[in-house]
């Protein structure tokens, strides 16, 4: 490595931090996914295999979303998007319903941006925590999110361009699921019909 290459790398890291894209580049390069693989291996060695596979968290989670019992509305009604209804059931690895589990859900708006980071949105828009009912069920109303890409003028996209890779993600929804005496689950789903459904920038 030459001194010029070394300082170019240092300057890149400075720009990455200034643009607050460190969490984006580690996800885009697969480093965060590698962390999941390490934790999966540790769980398997400890005899804790089974259940829904974990996926990456990503850099856009915000703690403290409003808590609801059984059901919630995620959107604030400002964004005229397509209405989305989703329901599910939380179960343990034996297939038994988990009452009182907390489903922490968040996603982007129709413009592909997230509340808190996009200050034009209301606080905790498209972010809620839902406590499952006696049968482990939860449900929510929201709007269909949009996919999005890395900022085109940012350091992450600059690196991806040099690697010959796009920076796009399909529309998706994030989940944290937790319950007493159970492992915390981080997962997400991609929405069917998106052109990047099977071509996402990020391995989840």
Regions found by a protein language model. Give the residues of each.
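Beta-strand-dominated extracellular/periplasmic modules and repeats
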Residues: 1-201
